[in-house]
From Swiss-Prot:
Multifunctional protein with various roles in different cellular compartments. May act in a redox sensitive manner. Associates with chromatin and binds DNA with a preference for non-canonical DNA structures such as single-stranded DNA. Can bend DNA and enhance DNA flexibility by looping thus providing a mechanism to promote activities on various gene promoters. Proposed to be involved in the innate immune response to nucleic acids by acting as a cytoplasmic promiscuous immunogenic DNA/RNA sensor. Negatively regulates B-cell and myeloid cell differentiation. The modification Phosphoserine is found at S98. Belongs to the HMGB family. One of its GO terms (molecular function) is double-stranded DNA binding. It is found in: Nucleus; Chromosome; Cytoplasm. Disulfide bonds join C23-C45. The lineage of its organism: Eukaryota, Metazoa, Chordata, Craniata, Vertebrata. This is High mobility group protein B3.
């Protein structure tokens, strides 16, 4: 059985992935006969990345941004034929954020304003460190809020299913909802990075 969909666009690469790819190419040019020890190579790349300045990382950030544009464009073209998968209904209730994501939403703008030009990965890393340093009592307000949003989401899903997917009265809200979704998409990549930091 074929694995995945061969027509599906290649996934977008992060700035760090482009950096690792560049390191691998450099290694092949300098030592074409020497095989790469993946574990050792990954460790060296990680250490080198941590010591690089924002300016040095910026070219990889630009490469990642360009690749995201490529990926988004290809996914848009690919979208409707996504392996027979049902297209996401824009009227469906949006999955609620976790307590960690609520914390990120509050502090992400503060980190960005305090560190102009900071990369998405570094923002996510800082947020992950800040969250891990909070005590349970400091995390509780975010967790409580997330629990309430989850309750509301479950109720909205039940209402949504009972009313059916298409409700004519909701037509006027579609435009506003679309704008919110577009804004949400901009944060998707940051949230993916933040999710990784929360899991570490």
């Amino acid at each position: 059985m074929a694995k995945g969909d061969p027509k599906k666009p290649k996934g977008k690469m992060s700035a760090y992935a482009f950096f690792v790819q560049t390191c691998r190419e450099e290694h092949k040019k300098k030592n074409p006969e020497v095989p790469v020890n993946f574990a050792e190579f990954s460790k060296k790349c990680s250490e080198r990345w941590k010591t690089m300045s924002g300016k040095e990382k910026s070219k990889f950030d630009e490469m990642a941004k360009a690749d995201k544009v490529r990926y988004d464009r290809e996914m848009k073209d690919y979208g409707p034929a996504k392996g027979g998968k049902k297209k996401k209904d824009p009227n469906a209730p949006k999955r609620p954020p976790s307590g960690f994501f609520l914390f990120c939403s509050e502090f992400r703008p503060k980190i960005k304003s305090a560190n102009p030009g900071i990369s998405i990965g570094d923002v996510a890393k800082k947020l992950g460190e800040m969250w891990n340093n909070l005590s349970d009592s400091e995390k509780q307000p975010y967790i409580n809020k997330a629990a309430k949003l989850k309750e509301k989401y479950e109720k909205d899903v039940a209402d949504y299913k009972s009313k059916g997917k298409f409700d004519g009265a909701k037509g006027a809200a579609k435009v506003a909802r679309k704008k919110v979704e577009e804004e949400d998409e901009e944060d998707e990549e940051e949230e993916e990075e933040e999710e990784e930091e929360e899991d570490e």
